[in-house]
Amino acid sequence: MAALRLLLGIDYGTKQIGVAVGQAITGQARELCTLKAQNGVPDWDKVQALINEWKPDAIVVGLPLNMDGTPSDMSARAEKFSRKLNGRFGVTVYTHDERLTTFEAKGERMARGGQKGSYRDNPVDAIAAALLLQGWLDEHPELLNV
C-alpha cells in the first residue's frame, strides 16, 4: 500500500457531518467544515467538491461505539456511509473509534471561549472530526509518508 499523505476525517451524523483534514508531514489534524445532512444523507455534490479540492489519499470515518466497545445504533449507519464514500469516489476509507469525541469537542469549544448559542447553530462536529482523525493519525504512523 502506498503511504498516505493527506486524509479527511468525518464525524458522521444524521443532521450534520463534521469534516477535518490531516497531513502526514505534520501528523496533525484540524477542523475543516460542517456539512448538513438529511437523515444521514449529505449533499453528495458538496462531498465531491471537498474530495476534488483536497484530493485525500484516504478518509477516516468515526465509528460510534458504545462505552463497552460494542456497536451502537449508529455504527451500522456509519459503516454504510463509509462504504458509500468508497463506492462513489474510489477512495480508501478507514473507520476509527469515535467514543467521547463530541464530548471532548464541546470541552474544546468551551476552552476556546465558550459556546455561543446552541450546538445546532454552532456545531462542534468539525472539531469532533479533527479529534477522531488525530486519534487515527496517532495510532497509525506506519501508514503515513513522513
Swiss-Prot record:
GO-annotated molecular function: nuclease activity
Any Pfam family hit: RuvX
Lineage: Bacteria, Pseudomonadati, Pseudomonadota, Gammaproteobacteria, Pseudomonadales
SUPFAM superfamilies: Ribonuclease H-like
One BP term from GO: rRNA 5'-end processing
Compartment(s) of residence: Cytoplasm
Descriptive protein name: Putative pre-16S rRNA nuclease
Highest taxon of the lineage: Bacteria
Role according to the record: Could be a nuclease involved in processing of the 5'-end of pre-16S rRNA.
SMART domains according to UniProt: YqgFc
NCBIfam families with a match to the protein in the record: RNAse_H_YqgF
CDD domains: YqgF
